[in-house]
């Protein structure tokens, strides 16, 4: 059966609703004709059908006082009016009885169907509808007056508004109703260009036979009394009939509203030219209806909106799909940055064949965006991002500065860490190709610094001059990589390599946070009763007594202690201050120890960690208004830190606080800011430094480019492009600068950079009921990172304020950053499958296409690689750590001998050579761990913001 509009689709207006910019664009899965999942982005609706708001008005009160009352409404899902509670139900999937659909088809087949009706007002529309020969003029007048009667809407506001009102009160409050319609919260959720459809259903005693009418207006007209939201109406459906048992016309009206809310039926009925087309669209809907057995479910149950639905595009006519496919291909060619083909690399990774050609292309590509990189930062969300990332950066600078000071025996310290972070980070944000990247000291680079210092100490070398030559060689090697466009190799960095490296970084964050807390507990030990190591005695001058005599004495209270004769008094009964007041001397290791610091530090540690997690996830909860939830989510880390600081200030315990250097001078006494090229080292060492520099260059390249690949994934919908060559060039220049000043080496920090992007997510404001906010992309700009690093530089002068921040609170934020990044990885979800019995495993797409044993094998290989990386990092063999990172790519290449390309497509990503073995029309497994109810449910119905994580789902 042909659907309406299919036979004339190739006509002049064939592309009226198939606009390539809207079919694909930058909306990702669910865009175009895949349904109304992209309606909330606020873009123009001229190239696709507008969103339809459907309202069901039911005729109630027969035979005493007839009135139209709103009982249901539809956008994407159904909302019923709970009359007893006086409120709208939660959006849910509508369920229909098959007899109601069959009855609706019969009514439409025998009723009035007006397509492209020229009516311009409700009166003209009603006059055409009531022109029924079977009705007498008197009944026509009664029916016309009834249809023109103002319906009673249920508009929820913050105030108390009764559902039922007297006629006199209704007349006096019409102006109030009009005002309420304009203030209706639902109106704020509708995108521009939305239209309305009114369905009127009910029973009339004076009718002898059913009266049905379906009207499609030629031009949308505002039929203001009919709908609660003032919108131009496109469709009008009337279903009236004689009184019957039950509420059959109520269900028939619901069936009509559900039909109009269906994307395929709506598309067809907008193009229908006669009754046959209308009935064909209804029959096509009936062919896809799924029936549930009556004894196996509760008909009153309300099914919540699903997270995933099948692609609506597959439900449209084949001819439309062909045109849509062509439109998608042309849009992909126009914007191949977001939707490039399987064999075509993105523009940033296309070889130019010229020396420094990739760098020149990056500079040209980013130059046109430079003014907007600052103007786009004028948003309150950027203020939250600055606070969050500033505290994370300061904490990172202090932590790695302290670790670097210990590793180099004071050759570098916290001050160098602050200065290097500020200068290198600010310079990178101003000049880099991807300014959202946050430069910082990283665990792998710190390991290399420790090994380099140990080598210098063992062979009596001057460390900083030797380090300078290593930095010069690293900068030279990196510039050579930029000149030869070696960044194109990032195409071989698949999810396997990214997850292995980034899981290691996340584990380093978690390990350092927990390790710092354990060191703090050792510094402030927990006092256990009866332990001699924590005893404290008060010794009076000139009196005898010993500890053993005191320990054998039992005391009931403090007065017994004060009356004892021996010269030693246990300070657990007598405070040191009381001992000194009475002329004694406190003696013992714990006399000046506050016993509550260790436990209180643990409390602050877990409070900040759990609070940050809870506030971050409150956005998806049902608590508080949406604006409050968004503020809590955006400022989650800042609020967690403030809560920890407030709790610490309230109790007033002497917990360790943030230490910020107050003097601007090198940590190592006697050295200036510029490092001498040779010092006490022989001249040939400048050449020998090339060997460790080669290993460090591999580490810098891998660390920088893996982070860049993750940040520039297409799922994040970045509009301004990447800059792989330009970023590596900036890192090379900064490597030379920091080496000359004796500052730490800096490279892209994966976890903090992802946290930076997480704090700059953009989501749609207009969200219809039942729909989650639509992820729109990242707020791309340079100002947040620049301000963060400027504040880091002036933090030396903010010491009076920063000194009140407890270190356990910052350790908790570190733990949160590591856990959040690790837990959101696809790798961790597959690890959970290892520990999950088969019957409890979720129904995910990955397990539908790959055998479970193969999934476990792939996960086990990843775990083995991660464990090997951790062991090498923690042993003296860490000097080969950069080679092991490069070895991840080799391991991934070797997996081609174990797994088929189809399995690797679902488990990982394909390398350039592997893509040639897969058809171009292959399925794209973008949501491997989304629980779908259909084999075709591979596209998200509503593309949500991807969690800013190590590996994007």
UniProtKB/Swiss-Prot annotation:
| Subcellular location, principal | membrane
Stated regulation of activity: 4,4'-diisothiocyanatodihydrostilbene-2,2'- disulfonic acid (H2DIDS) potently inhibits chloride/hydrogencarbonate antiporter activity with 50% inhibition at about 5 uM. Completely inhibits chloride/hydrogencarbonate antiporter activity at 200 uM of 4,4'-diisothiocyano-trans-stilbene-2,2'-disulfonic acid (DIDS).
User: Which cysteine pairs are covalently linked by disulfides here?
Assistant: none
Region annotated Disordered sits at 20-41, 916-938
- The residues that the database entry marks as glycosylated are 546, 570, 932, 949
Q: Per UniProt, which keywords does this protein have?
A: Anion exchange, Antiport, Cell membrane, Glycoprotein, Ion transport, Membrane, Transmembrane, Transmembrane helix, Transport
Location of the protein in the cell: Basolateral cell membrane
Q: Which gene encodes it?
A: Slc4a9
Cross-referenced Gene3D superfamilies, in alphabetical order? Helical hairpin bin, Mannitol-specific EII, Chain A
Return the protein name.
Anion exchange protein 4
Q: Name the species this protein comes from.
A: Rattus norvegicus
Entry-linked PANTHER family = ANION EXCHANGE PROTEIN (PTHR11453), ANION EXCHANGE PROTEIN 4 (PTHR11453:SF52)
GO cellular component terms given for this protein: apical part of cell; basolateral plasma membrane; membrane; plasma membrane
